[in-house]
Amino acid sequence: MTANPQRGEIWLVQLDPTRGQEIQKTRPAVVISSEMFSSIPMRIIIPVATWQPKFQNRPFMILIQRTEENCLDADSAGNVLQVRSVTTERFVRCIGKVSETVVQELVIGLIICVDYRP
């Protein structure tokens, strides 16, 4: 059975093989793809790492506070510089869901990183 990750869900995703500074291993990631593309077996994700104080001044590290709904082990950060598209075959299992507010904060972080100016 193929996974069908939805926007805002946190999934464990197999990110290997990687190169250079790409974030590695199987780790949580937030799906930010529009539901408009759910029939395509690819998703846009933002990998998640455990929050560290040094992330405070890094605009590409978006705080995701641990909640019962997201089921993260600790406060974490979405690393928007590591955004990528991956096949749904890389998705292991859903572990939780973030709020729409967190999804929007991640998207805003991505907009800042690409210097988008409407």
Residue ranges and their predicted role:
Residues M1-P118:
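Conserved functional hotspots at enzyme active or ligand-binding sites that engage polyanionic ligands
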